[in-house]
């Protein structure tokens, strides 16, 4: 998995991480999600969601049949869980300590994840988040 993380680190932008986590949340019931659901969740256009889902598929983090359901691969699920475990504490700490605007905190937390993605295991450990679950629904005003 470490090799995969290093290969993907250069390609996982803050936006890709956001889509990965949103897709994971939508797929949590085990039924998968549609691009239109991801678009609605993130308040983006359907073409934008489709393009980013295709990007996640090309990285081996998701699968999608034409006009079908999006599902995360086991690697995608693992990466999404790791990102979620880091995202929420980063967001909460910045929001509490710096009193920044919520949207700015979201953006900065995603940028931190993207910049330190190669070392995300260390980041998760340092944030002491191994057994803490933070629902994405609270992070995004949906």
Give, region by region, the residue ranges found by the protein language model.
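A short, conserved structural fragment
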Residues: 57-67
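Alpha-helical linker/hinge and terminal dimerization helices associated
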Residues: 83-97, 101, 119
């Amino acid at each position: 998995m470490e090799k995969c993380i290093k290969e993907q680190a250069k390609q996982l932008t803050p936006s890709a991480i956001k889509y990965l986590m949103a897709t994971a949340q939508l797929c949590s019931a085990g039924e998968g999600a549609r691009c239109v659901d991801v678009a609605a969740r993130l308040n983006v256009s359907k073409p934008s969601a489709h393009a980013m889902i295709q990007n996640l598929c090309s990285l081996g983090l998701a699968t999608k049949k034409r006009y079908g359901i999006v599902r995360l691969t086991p690697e995608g699920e693992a990466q999404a869980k790791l990102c979620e475990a880091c995202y929420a504490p980063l967001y909460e700490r910045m929001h509490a300590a710096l009193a920044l605007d919520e949207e700015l905190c979201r953006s900065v937390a995603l940028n931190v994840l993207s910049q330190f993605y190669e070392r995300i295991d260390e980041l998760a450990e340092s944030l002491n988040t191994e057994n803490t679950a933070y629902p994405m629904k609270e992070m995004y005003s949906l």
